[in-house]
């Protein structure tokens, strides 16, 4: 549950971004989501490294193993000079997440040129994931190194002291989305979280189902369905069911590319890597 203290911290980050000149709430959420996503990639990598150390088993890595690739990790750059952080994120990390393929980030040469990941997938549908489609025109709009440093410090404070699990992260995201409570030009409305939860509990989705939201917005219903399935079936799901869960189970449509981009990242943050998100 989001406490008053957590809301105050989120509001402080929000105010810092507004003071930097970004006043559109949707743009603020979009930029914050990028930063949350970048941080989550490093967290997943740290978990993988910990598992490797305990088991001795080699695992696939998200980040390239070169010095430049490792410099793109949140834990590596977060304490650097703000200007250096800004350069790393704007010139390497952000272009890298836009070109992420199959859970891997591309590397860069010493001259700063991206080394594209070779895609051996024959099926075009598998190449063109929702994440790749809607990140292709994403823009990094955080205006200054100082604003970026405040966002990084604020998010670190939240995650290290207040956000303990996926449920809490979802609540945090829902609180930010609550700032979009007025209808947009295209009639976007945010469904309150308790209504979403009630509807999902009435549906009682199972790991065998296919779930579609024809007006998905930021994928609130799809994420809630995923959380319901996890809480009721996580311990009994087969490998085939987990594979179904990671993508084909969830389909969403919307008319706004920004909302679709937020959907793809929201689902990715909840470990749904290949959803069917489209116009």
Segments and roles (model prediction):
Residues 1-207, 276-279:
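Non-catalytic, mostly N-terminal accessory regions of nucleic-acid modification and defense proteins
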Residues 186-279:
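Conserved S-adenosyl-L-methionine
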């Amino acid at each position: 549950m989001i406490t008053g203290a957590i809301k105050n911290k989120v509001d402080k980050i929000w105010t810092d971004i507004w003071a930097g000149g970004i006043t559109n709430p949707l743009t603020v959420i979009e930029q914050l989501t990028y930063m949350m996503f970048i941080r989550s990639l490093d967290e997943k990598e740290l978990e993988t490294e910990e598992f490797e150390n305990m088991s001795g088993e080699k695992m696939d890595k998200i980040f390239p193993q070169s010095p430049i690739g490792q410099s793109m990790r949140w834990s590596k750059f977060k304490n650097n000079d703000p200007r250096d952080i800004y350069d790393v994120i704007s010139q390497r990390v952000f272009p890298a997440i836009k070109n992420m393929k199959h859970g891997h980030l591309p590397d860069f040469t010493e001259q700063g040129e991206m080394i594209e990941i070779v895609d051996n997938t024959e099926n075009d549908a598998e190449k063109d994931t929702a994440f790749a489609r809607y990140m292709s025109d994403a823009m990094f709009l955080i205006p200054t190194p100082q604003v970026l440093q405040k966002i990084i410090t604020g998010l670190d404070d939240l995650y290290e002291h207040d956000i303990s699990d996926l449920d809490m992260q979802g609540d945090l995201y829902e609180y930010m989305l609550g700032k979009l409570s007025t209808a947009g030009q295209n009639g976007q409305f945010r469904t309150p979280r308790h209504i979403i939860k009630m509807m999902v509990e009435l549906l009682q989705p199972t790991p065998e189902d296919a779930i579609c939201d024809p007006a998905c917005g930021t994928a609130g219903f799809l994420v809630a369905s995923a959380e319901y399935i996890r809480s009721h079936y996580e311990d009994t799901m087969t490998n085939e069911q987990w594979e179904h869960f990671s993508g084909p189970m969830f389909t969403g449509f919307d008319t706004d590319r920004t909302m679709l981009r937020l959907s793809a990242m929201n689902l990715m943050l909840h470990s749904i890597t290949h959803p069917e998100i489209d116009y």
